[in-house]
C-alpha cells in the first residue's frame, strides 16, 4: 500500500469541463479509462470550475477507488448509505476533475449521458 501523505501522491487536475444535460431518464456520469498496478488505484473528486476546493458530495474521501484495467469505469461517490454515479445535480455546470493516481495510469476521462435510470448500490 501507499503510505504517503495525500499531497505526495501522484495526481492531476483537469481544465474546467462542462457536465452534460441529459434527457430523462438518463443522467450524466464520469467514465474513467485507467490501468492500475496490483496496489494502485484511481480516486476522483470534482471541484468548482474556478475553485481549488472539492464539491461537498464529490470528495476524494467519498470516492470509490478504481482498481484494475477499465476502458470505461464509472466513477462513484458514497452518499448516505449507497454509492452514486449520477452528476445530475451538476448538469449544465463546469467542473474540474481531480484524480489521485498512485500506481495507476489514466488514459481518458469522459463525461457522458446514460440511457436509463441509475441503480444505486450499497
Regions found by a protein language model. Give the residues of each.
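Beta-rich accessory regions
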Residues: 1-122
